[in-house]
Structures are given as structure tokens and as C-alpha cells.
């Protein structure tokens, strides 16, 4: 599919079985994908052409791609060395505690556990990097926790991003990710099933810098209106006759700015 016209610019591709249900039913679709997914064997990475506006690529217009195989697996497709259905034997939402994770790891700003309650074994964690390989090392420590055996995936976002605002967190995460470069697998001995391994994949969706990531390109700042513009629009709103007042979307993102220039300072 990555060779089919505009699909060559795709960065994240998810495949599901034909009977997975409506692809517009995101909750059910995610449940099916994660039920069928072994992070260690069912995610494929490649590289190729990317949109020139994709700022996360190490090289302009060329970067990593990821295909997640969320289809049903036949017996011959299953690697028996892995725990076959991670997460089915325990309720991760009752095991993991956001406050405890923040206490153990001071670089964590916020933890979103809400997907676990929906039978989607995925966490979103806001983290403030302060060194090279920070997110990789953090993921190895988090993935080794016994409470994490039911979790298949962790998405790391910048500390300025509200991990509990799911649409915004996923938007920022996907923008800042090169899947091939920014993933890491944590393989652990199962503490529940003897002679089996479990896997949790982590993705670094934080901003990339020369200092911490050896990233050589400019990193764009998020775009927001200044206070003067916001105030001017608010004052004129009733004259536009376009309906009830809507606060400026920029207000929500001002805390995610890094400096005042077009590029992150």
C-alpha cells in the first residue's frame, strides 16, 4: 500500500481483519487491534518518502513508517515463546496507579490510564526529557514493573501536553514521531505464565532536539495567536453573526509554546 500513489506519504498504517467491524467505530476497532496484537512480532517498520511538512523526519521528505498488524492470527502465525494474550489475565486499570508512577519517576508529568478501562492496553505518559536516551531508559524501567505485564503499548508525549486530553495528546504524539527511529521494545519474563515472555512497545512522541536526540533540523513551534489578536477577535465576535461565542483555540495551546519564535528555542 505504501507504493500506491499518495499512500507513499503515510506514516502509520493499521491493518484489521475484514470482520473487525466499522472502521469508524474507533473504540471497538482499537479493542480488536490490541486483542490481536503482539508488540514484538506484529509491528513492522520501514522507511520511505514523507510529506515535506513532516517535521519529525531526520531528513527532509524521508522518514520512518510503521504498519500495525491487528488482524486475527492463525495458529501457525503465533510465536509460542510469547504470552499469547497479554492483558487477558488481569485488569490493568486496577493494578497501575498514576500517582505511584509519578512518585517513582519524577520526570513524569501526567499519566493517562483511561484506555485500560476500555480494554485497550495502552498508556499515554507526559514526560520531561533532560538527557539523551531518556525516554528509552524510562520505558525500560516502566516496562519492567510487574503491574505493566498487561500493557502492550506506551505513548510518550511532551511534558507540556495534557496526557489526559486524548485527541490533543494523540495529535501531538503523531506529529512528533518517526516510528522507525522512535520505538523501543521492552521484553520481560512473564510473571504469570511460566516460560513465556511479554512485550511492551514504547514510542517517543516528544519533541526532538540536537542536545538530547542528535536531531539536526529545526523543530517548529506550535502555532497560536497572540493575546492582542485573540482580544481583537473576541471584541468583534458579535459583529460576525456566526453563532454563539467560541473561545480562541489558541488559549488551550499557549502552555505548549517553547519561546516566541517560529522555531523551538
What residue spans do the PLM features occupy?
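Charged, compositionally biased interaction regions
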Residues: 1-265
